Amino acid sequence: MGLHKLPAHLTLFSPAALIATFFGAGLLKPASGTWGSLAALAPGLLIADAYGALGLMLGTVLAYGLGHWASAAWIDGAPNSADEERNADKDPSPIVIDEVAGMWLTLIPLTLFGAALTPLGVAAAFALFRLFDITKPWPVSWADKQLNGATGVMLDDILAGIWAAIVLLAARQFGLI
C-alpha cells in the first residue's frame, strides 16, 4: 500500500486538495475509488440518520458542486507533462470526491419513506456503487469517455450512483434488502 502524490501546484492542506481527496482518502492506493467510497459511508450514514433522504440529496448536490470546483482546480492547474499519477488529466485517481457524491446518491433509496438503514442495505449500496463505477455501463461509460475536465470526473460517478440506486430501489421493492 502506498500513497498518491499531489500535483505540484497543490499542498496537502489546500482546500482543493482536501475536498478532491476527501480529506486524504484518495491518496491511498491501490483502489483509490474504493477507499473514497468507503470513506464516504460514515458521513453519509450520519447525514442519513440525522436528515434522511433530503439530507443525502442536499449532501450529494453539495459534494458535486464542491467536487467540480476542486477537480477543476486539480486538473486545470496541473502541468502538461506526462505523469502517471494524473492519469493523463482525464480522471486522476486521487480525486475521490466524485465517489463521495455517487455513494451518497446511492444511499438515498435506503432512506426513502422512513426505511431504516440496515447493514445489508448499506453493504449492498457500497457493492452496487463500486460495481457500476468500475464496470461503467452506459451512460456511465459515455460520460467517462466523452466528457473532459471536472464535469467528466464528477458525472460518471453520479450516473453510476443512479444505476446503483435504481437496483437498490428494485431490491427494496422485492423485499431483498
Show the residue positions of the predicted features.
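Hydrophobic alpha-helical transmembrane segments
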Residues: 1-89, 93, 100-177
